[in-house]
UniProtKB/Swiss-Prot annotation:
It holds the Pfam family NAD_binding_3. Belongs to the L-aspartate dehydrogenase family. One of its GO terms (molecular function) is NADP binding. InterPro entries: Asp/hSer_DH_NAD-bd (IPR005106), Asp_DH (IPR002811), L-Asp_DH (IPR011182), NAD(P)-bd_dom_sf (IPR036291). One of its GO terms (biological process) is NAD biosynthetic process. This is Aspartate dehydrogenase domain-containing protein. SUPFAM superfamilies: Glyceraldehyde-3-phosphate dehydrogenase-like, C-terminal domain, NAD(P)-binding Rossmann-fold domains. Gene3D superfamilies: Dihydrodipicolinate Reductase, domain 2, NAD(P)-binding Rossmann-like Domain.
Amino acid sequence: MADKALKVGIVGYGHLGQFLVEKIQSEGAEVGLQLAFVWNRNADKLKDSLPKDLILHDLSDFTQRDTDVIVEVCHPLIVKEFGVRFLSHAHFLVGSPSALSDGQLEQDLRTAAKQQGKTLYVPSGALWGGQDIQKMNDSGTLRALSIRMSKHPSCFRLTGGLLSDWTEGEGRRVLYRGSVAELCPLAPNNVNTMAAAAIAASKLGFHGVTGEIVSDTALADYHVVEVDVTGPDGFSVKTMRQNPAKLGAVTGKATYNSFWSSLLVCKGHGGRVYLC
């Protein structure tokens, strides 16, 4: 057990938030984590599973809690509204990195992290090889990056009714292919993997990384993420990740454990953005 437990604030109590809270409650003492607060838009959802003193009713009151790391697992709008403020108080693990497709917000968060000496953590989630992509980016050898995410249509949460007409057995349908910057607002809860890639590949950025989302009724048991990296002189790497997932699940099973592993890294890496 660590000498001093890191105090963690959890913002959001959906499937992932609940998983993290239960994990900290059951294993936190062993790994040096303890809950500072939990906030949910509907606080009634918290009262049967948490002590009253851990429930934060007004998110603006987070500054009144002694917190080392704030974890957002809620919605990109929370990142936009509170991200800079979070970084003035604690390290910030952003579970909705698609919010950073807003170029001004990304710059504001990077600036806040640098000025406050706090780390903006971006979880790699379902992205395989994120650290390698970041190394190529930093060394100037990354030429192109594209990511395809394929899921059963029930697993997408899209704006504008983009997939409202799907029928079981229709097969494969490409919903979008283009810049990740334009994709993020269409599928803010489904493209965090691509957002993490765009942050790792910061020289290409959200406008330079290509994203594709595919609806496929054959994918009843898995989410599939394919990453295609291009470097100089014909260098390329292609990976395919199959992540077990139930029908209707936005997040695959393996991503929960990946997120937990990311949280364990959040012990302070200076005033910068850090892929974990």
